[in-house]
Amino acid sequence: MGKQEVRTRSGERVAIVAGLRTPFARQSTEFGQVPAVDLGKMVVQEMMARTAIDPKLIEQVVFGQVVQMPEAPNIAREIVLGTGMSINTDAYSVTRACATSFQAAVNVAESIMAGSIDIGIAGGADSSSVLPIGVSKKLAASLLALSKTKTVGQKLKLLSNLSFKDLMPVPPAVAEYSTGLSMGQTAEQMAKSYAISRAEQDALAHRSHTLAAQAWAEGKIRDEVMTAFPEPYKKWLDMDNNIRMDSKLESYAKLRPAFDRQYGSVTAANSTPLTDGAAAIMLMREGKAKELGLEIMGYIRSYAFAAIGVEKDMLMGPSYATPIALDRAGITLNDLTLIDMHEAFAAQTLANLKMFASDKFAQEQLGRAQAIGEVDMSKFNVLGGSLAYGHPFAATGARMITQTLRELKRRGGGLALNTACAAGGLGAAMILEVE
C-alpha cells in the first residue's frame, strides 16, 4: 500500500470520466485571433455535450492560464458563465507554469477527496498569439497622469515629454523573472552539463513527430480532439498543425542553434513551439460516476510536486517529483505500463531520462540509496510528445492525462506515469491507473 490514498473518506476513488482538447495550433495560425478564455469555453462546452451530462451538475471548475490576460483574470469563472453551468458553480484559476493543468486536476481531486464536491472539471488554456502587449514605464506613468489633467495645455505638456522610444510596445517577457534566463537557455545549459549531443536531440524530436503522426494516422488521437470552429466561423481545425507528418531525420540537422549560435545544440526543431490550445478533464467521485452510468476512463493513484533551484538545471523537475509519486503509489518504475514525459525540449527530456537512471544523482540530490531506474523506451512517450503536438502551457497536463488513459485502455489497463518540468524550477508527477 502506498503512502498516499487518493480516495474519499468513505474509500471511493477519484475517477476521470472524460477528457478532451482542442487541436493544438502553432502561434499565429488557425487560432491566431482566439483568446485563451474562448479556447477554454470551447473545449469545456464540447466535453459536457459529449458526456451528455447536465451542466448544472458541475460543482467546481479549476482552470489555468499561464499567459494571463488582464481582461479575464479568472478564466475558470468565465468558462462557467459562458458554458451553461449553474451560476452557483464554484470556479477559480491556478497557475503552475507548464504543470498548470496537473495542479488543476489535483485541486479538483482534493475537493472530491474532502467530500466538498462530487463532480468537477479541471484543465487549462493558453494563447501565444493573443498576448498582453505592454507599454514603457514612462508611457504608463504619463497615461495615468493624463487621466488626471483638466486642461488641453496640461495634456499637451505631458505628451511633449514622451519620445518615440517611449511609445514603442513592450513585448511579453520570455525570461525567468528571478534569473533573467529563458527556458531555451536553460535547456542549452542542461545539454552541455549532461553531455546531450545534437544528434541525440534531433533523434528524439524525429521520434516524437513520427510517433505522433502515426498515432493520428491510426485514429488513436481522433476521439480526444474536437473540431474547432473559431470566429468568424469560416474555417475549422480538426487536428494539430505542428506535427511533421513526413518527418525525416536528416532535415533536423539543417537548422542553426537558437540560443547559443556558436556552440549550441538546441534548435527550433528539437524544441516545442509556441502553441495555442485548450484541454480539460472531468473528475468524479467513483460512486457518482457509476450512479450516472458514465464509463470511467481511469483513476488518479498518486501525485507529487517538487521545487528546485533555478540558476541551473531548472527543467529537471521530473527527476525530483517522479520518485515521490512512485513511492506514494507504492510502486516502482518497472511496474509502469506507460511513461509520458512532457517534452519541452529534447535536451531537457534526455537529461531527465539520464538522471532517472543515475545512482549518483539519486544519492547526491535526492538522498536515495539508488536510482529509480532506466526507462524502457518501448514504454516512453509511445504516441509522441510535446515536441510534436505543441505546448499551450496550461493545457499540456490535461492533454497528457487524457492521452495516457486512452492508451492504457487500449493496452488492457495498467499503471502510467505523467511527469512535467515547469518554469521556476518546478516539477510535477502523477500516477494514473486503468483497470
Curated annotation (Swiss-Prot):
Catalytic activity: an acyl-CoA + acetyl-CoA = a 3-oxoacyl-CoA + CoA
Pfam families per record: Thiolase_C, Thiolase_N
Domain of life from the UniProt record: Bacteria
Pathway: Lipid metabolism; fatty acid beta-oxidation
Biological process annotations from GO: fatty acid beta-oxidation
Keywords carried by this UniProt record: Acyltransferase, Cytoplasm, Fatty acid metabolism, Lipid degradation, Lipid metabolism, Transferase
UniProt-listed InterPro entries: Ac-CoA_C-AcTrfase_FadI, Thiolase, Thiolase-like, Thiolase_C, Thiolase_CS, Thiolase_N
Keyword Acyltransferase recorded: yes
Annotated active site: 98 (acyl-thioester intermediate), 391 (proton acceptor), 421 (proton acceptor)
Gene Ontology molecular function: acetyl-CoA C-acetyltransferase activity
SUPFAM superfamilies in UniProt: Thiolase-like (SSF53901)
Entry EC number(s): 2.3.1.16
Subcellular location(s) per record: Cytoplasm
Presence of keyword Metal-binding: no
Enzyme class: transferase
GO cellular component: cytosol
Binding partners and assembly: Heterotetramer of two alpha chains (FadJ) and two beta chains (FadI).
PANTHER family xref list: ACETYL-COA ACETYLTRANSFERASE, CYTOSOLIC, ACETYL-COA C-ACYLTRANSFERASE
Family: Belongs to the thiolase-like superfamily. Thiolase family.
Functional summary from the UniProt entry: Catalyzes the final step of fatty acid oxidation in which acetyl-CoA is released and the CoA ester of a fatty acid two carbons shorter is formed.
Identification of the protein by name: 3-ketoacyl-CoA thiolase
Organism: Vibrio cholerae serotype O1 (strain ATCC 39315 / El Tor Inaba N16961)
High-level lineage: Bacteria, Pseudomonadati, Pseudomonadota, Gammaproteobacteria, Vibrionales
